[in-house]
Amino acid sequence: MNSLLRCCLIKPINIKNTTSFINKLNPKSIIQKSNNYNNINKNILNKFKDSSSNYFINSNKILEICNNNNNNNKYNVNKRNYSSSSNSGNNNNNNYNNKNNNNNNESFYKKFENSFEIKRIKDILFIIVGTFVIFKIYDNKIGIVFCENEIDKETILNDPYDKIPNEIIVELKDSAKDDNIIEESDEDDGIKKISSFKLFFKTIGNDIWLFGFGIITAFFSSWVGLQIPKVFGVLIDCTKNGDSLQGPAIQAIFILLAQAGLNFLYSTMISVACERYSARLRSTLFGAMLEQEIGFFDQNSTGDLINRLSSDVQLVRSALKHSVSLGVKSFGQIVGGVISLILISPKLSLGMMTILPTMVSVGTFYAGWLKSLSVRSQRAQAQSTIVAEEAIGNIRTVQAFSNQHYESERFIEKNQHSLALSTESGVQIGIFQGVTSLALNSVSLLVYWYGGTLVSRGEMTGGQLTSFIIHTMNMQSSFSQLSILFTQIMSAMGGMQRITELINRVPLINSNQGFKLRELKGEIKFINVDFKYPTRPHVHVLNGLNLTLKPGQVVALAGSSGGGKSTIAGLLERFYDISNGDITIDGYSIKQLNAKWLRSRIGIVSQEPSLFATTILENLRYGNPNATEDEIIEAAKLANAHQFISNFPKGYETIVGERGVQLSGGQKQRIAIARAILKNPQIIILDEATSALDSQSELLVQTALDNLMKGRTTLVIAHRLSTVQNADLIGVLSHGKIAEFGNHNELMNHKGLYYKLVQRQLSQQQQ
């Protein structure tokens, strides 16, 4: 069960002359029960009734709650020890009296004075323990907290939830019983750290059976292949002894046919399983990318992320396929070959085995080095991919500035670094394979020399030596395949490490947590908001911002470029979490609300709308996938887009091109407005929606925007101040705060920052 605490000072209280009181008390927030018991959930308080002293948490008890911003804004009990004189009637020595206060302030102080009369240590312990239990049971999320360092020193502003003069009250509001809350979810979206090994089994799913049967079939193929050298040895001995060759020849034919069939089966099963696995892995990785917060994409380039989806997954798929199809068979041939060699000639086998420890040691030494080198090479390759993606994605800009040579040089520079690392990796692989080949050839020479010696002594037959040599050659081939496969596996492990890191990354903003509201009115409040971008942690974009938008109100933001206007729009959609303060919608903190649900209730039209390289119809349906054709046409008409769409030869089936390049700016804007209308949001954000249009297009777009804004809370961000004159209220941003706030006429008469901005733009237009 969750509960929401709201602490509010109902009447503005002048505390200009109470510096000593503030310095003495220095509260971050004081939450105290009113004498009006109807404002308190009595059932909650009765649970913590002290039966021995018959005390309640009431006006004689203080609950001090600290808003800890470093702990996800959850409340913690601040264990301060407030005490007063043992004589409750003696108020002469009370440090909070101020002779200069008027009668109203004296009455205010007496209430605080009486509140701190805690006579016994038992009462203090009762307060601390009781408060801790309350907030443990009710798992408080966030409330409106007055902190001394976050409010005006002279005036504490009221919050109009309950109209009781001069009272500080607590409202314990059980969110689970709130009729406006229709769903609450604490799901973590299954985002848990998982090893690469577990990720494999989770991703391959039911295809693990197909994968397993493929492995078993590969082992059978290896076992069948081990019979071939034995049959060839028998054929040689039969020739020498004059025996019939028909039986061994037929046996050899059946063995070869069986091996071919088994090779087909295991290769097909493993290939199908690996292709399905790579498709699921790519989907899982892409899903993990989409769940990340916007700050993650600010810190990671598009090219690098695309490289993980393509190159890294391809490396893993290829290595997995070859490691099973070739690796399992080669491993089976090596193990079976060793057993067969021992059965044929223990002496010759013992001599050959002396070199195997050297081969294993060399392979182990190179394993870690090749893996780290592979990771570095893949990252360098990703950098060259980034340059290529940027250049091709902005090819019109590149060609407009005739910078093809410059972009080519950038790509060559990044590619050279990737080439150097790839070359180093190739050299190391060559060394490894050369050493492996030397070891295997040494084994072959040993077999030929010592085997011939044993045949001359009569300890082996010619057929046995032939069988032994064929087994040795098969083992040599298997070792060569494993050495090549080993380097592929090391590269794949580097790619898998990058994939697993991203899948395991827990987004800083979980879009699936929080509750949804049955009805969204659209009241928005920014309360003492501080914000810094993750990529610029030392730059304060917003600093103590306070802003209120009432339901259905149109509020415009003006100010110089880079002042934080678009940042406010991003924070409202919770693309980022604020550093300090709070943002509330209909009285609920934005951190409590389900982010996906919230964004589905917000429509945005930006200066450069993002359209997908598909049809106009599909772009419109992005606002509402379930919209009917009639609803789409009606939305297009309201956005003044239906006429120009109908004039296209293919109408709504017209392809708009990548990012809508085949449409004009005004056409893209009107499609974006129609898309927002289909979304039917309660809150609208217009981020410089008409600043890049000509006067004729602006008139059409502005008419469409007027249709969109009807009855909806609207936040308008504009550089051209002529577009915001009709707004209900205008806020002027300066140094991360609202410096001026009012309608157009009020701000012009004030002749402050807004007046200067208007005059500056008028003079620029005249010039």
Swiss-Prot record:
Domain ABC transporter: 524-760
Segments forming domain ABC transmembrane type-1: 211-491
Any single Gene Ontology cellular-component annotation: plasma membrane
Disulfide bond residue pairs: none
UniProt binding sites for ATP: 559-566
Membrane topology: Multi-pass membrane protein
Single GO molecular function: ABC-type oligopeptide transporter activity
Region (Disordered) location: 81-104
PROSITE patterns (alphabetical): ABC_TM1F, ABC_TRANSPORTER_1, ABC_TRANSPORTER_2
Gene3D superfamilies xrefs: ABC transporter type 1, transmembrane domain, P-loop containing nucleotide triphosphate hydrolases
Span of the signal peptide: none
Keyword terms of this UniProt record: ATP-binding, Membrane, Nucleotide-binding, Transmembrane, Transmembrane helix, Transport
Transmembrane segments: 208-228, 252-272, 324-344, 350-370, 429-449
Main location: membrane
GO biological process: oligopeptide export from mitochondrion; sorocarp morphogenesis
Pfam families associated with the record: ABC_membrane (PF00664), ABC_tran (PF00005)
Compartments in which it is found: Membrane
Presence of keyword Acyltransferase: no
Domain of life of the source: Eukaryota
Keyword Transmembrane: yes
Family: Belongs to the ABC transporter superfamily. ABCB family. Multidrug resistance exporter (TC 3.A.1.201) subfamily.
Record-given protein name: ABC transporter B family member 4
UniProt organism field: Dictyostelium discoideum (Social amoeba)
